[in-house]
Regions:
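C-terminal functional modules of predominantly eukaryotic multidomain proteins
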Residues: 386, 421, 428-429
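Short HxH-centered metal-ligating active-site micro-motif
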Residues: 406-410, 416-425
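Gram-negative host-targeted secretion-system effectors, predominantly Type III and Type IV
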Residues: 395, 399, 406-407
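Structured beta-strand segments within beta-sheet-rich domains
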Residues: 425-435
């Protein structure tokens, strides 16, 4: 009950405590018995109806928990409206905060699109642009000359490491004193076939990071109102072959090189190969420069990056793409996903279509037309998943959990601890040190 209906226990039954684990529990476990609302209700109750110091929760979550868990349980994804919601705060930000847009522009045939992206930013924005050759610099300066922006600085940089190297080596040092910043680059993803797949990847990035001018102001307000928010990333692409690759974790061949990079940089944050990093796939994202200071201060050089032709995956650039959220977490901030309101509808319909397509074949094998049949189907699926593949599925925990609870309730504390420690020594924990 402390996990499934904590708010009722606190408000109606006067329970004097709640479980820290509520915020780090996997969302799938809540979905066995609820619609996923318990943690959101608990947080709202503690914030609005008690004097509990919410900073304790935030600091503990950011220090000890994987954001894949607490951002989903607390529904921290930002859905951005296409009209300004808080004009007073937006005006105050533009007057009193320093805003920057960093861009790496390589494809001159996409210059109009890049200009349109920058045109959505408020007039107080400083724009820093890197490009790959001195010949492109005057073209970019001419294109951006008529935009209503505070300043535009264009620099030709070494063409090694593409947008990631340009961002860390040449642009980031200029962003350290800004309050809020956005990074974008002209993205084609030309390695994907057909070309529409790569173009749609770029659409996902730009649509959710900078849909229109009101979207930009609303995003700035999100940072202003949440002092723990460090990064806002667009959702990972789910179309074409991206669906299987990203929904299976998003790591690809990059888990070990990301862990190595974290060690080299001294980044200490919870990381797991079983949990997707909330990372800016495509390297288009919003951030608070303070949150990425541990990465910016490394002193990057273009020689740290492989020369062309750049491998499609598994490079230091791909590790950096995934390390951003962990850098922010080590600095005391958390990452979250940002979506435009219109794309959130598309994303929801897309995932429902995928889910229906995957469940329908199971329904042909198991009787899912009644609750009884659905329960048997879920139990059978979990049994196969656990016993054939040695993996605990979201529906496979009932008997194990009931046995654990019975032992805990009926044995002396010392005996229970010996049994659990013996089990962990032989079989290992299910996932992490808190799981029995």
């Amino acid at each position: 009950p402390l996990l499934v209906c904590p708010t009722r226990l606190l408000r109606e039954k006067k329970c004097p405590l709640f479980k820290r684990r509520s915020f780090m529990h996997e969302l799938e476990a809540y979905l066995n018995y609820t619609a996923g609302e318990p943690v959101q209700e608990l947080y709202a109750y503690l914030r609005d109806e008690t004097d509990y110091p919410m900073a304790l929760i935030w600091k503990n979550m950011i220090r000890t928990m994987h954001p894949h868990d607490f951002t989903r349980s607390l529904a921290l994804t930002r859905i951005i409206e296409p009209t300004v919601l808080d004009a007073v705060t937006a005006e105050s930000i533009c007057k009193n905060r320093r805003i920057a847009l960093a861009m790496h522009l390589y494809f001159m045939d996409m210059l109009d699109q890049s200009k349109a992206f920058a045109a959505k930013f408020p007039p107080e924005t400083d724009v820093f642009i890197s490009t790959s050759s001195a010949e492109k610099k005057p073209q970019i300066e001419a294109a951006f000359a008529d935009l209503n922006l505070h300043s535009v600085t264009v620099t030709a940089v070494e063409n090694q490491g593409r947008d990631v190297a340009a961002f860390l080596c040449d642009l980031a040092p200029q962003l350290k004193d800004y309050d809020y910043a956005c990074f974008m680059h002209d993205k084609k993803a030309i390695q994907t076939k057909p070309g529409s797949v790569g173009a749609s990847f770029g659409y996902v990035c730009n649509e959710n990071v900078c849909k229109n001018a009101a979207h930009v102001l609303n995003v700035l307000c999100e940072f202003e109102k949440d002092p723990y928010l460090g990064i806002l990333c667009p959702p990972y692409p789910t179309h074409g072959l991206y669906f299987m690759n990203m929904c299976s974790g998003g790591w690809g061949p990059n888990f070990e090189n990301t862990k190595k990079l974290m060690k080299d940089l001294g980044i200490d944050a919870p990381v797991s190969g079983e949990k997707s990093p909330i990372a800016p796939y495509g390297s288009v994202f919003w951030f608070r420069p303070k949150a990425l200071a541990p990465l910016f201060d490394h002193g990057w050089q273009h020689s740290d990056f492989p020369p062309e032709p750049l491998p499609q995956d598994g490079t230091i650039s791909h590790a950096i793409e995934r390390i951003y959220p962990f850098v922010a977490q080590s600095a005391g901030y958390y990452p979250a996903v940002v979506m435009s309101k219109s794309y959130a509808v598309t994303h929801n319909d897309t995932m429902q279509a995928y889910a229906s397509g995957m469940i329908r074949p199971l329904a042909r094998v198991f009787d899912c037309t009644t609750f009884y049949g659905a329960e048997n189907s879920a139990t059978g699926f979990a049994y196969k998943k656990h016993h054939l593949f040695s993996h605990y599925g979201p529906y496979s925990d009932s008997k194990r959990r009931h046995a654990r609870n019975w032992l805990r309730d009926n044995l002396p504390a010392g005996s229970y601890k010996v049994i659990i420690n013996t089990k962990r020594a032989i079989f290992g924990p299910h996932e992490g040190p808190y799981e029995d």
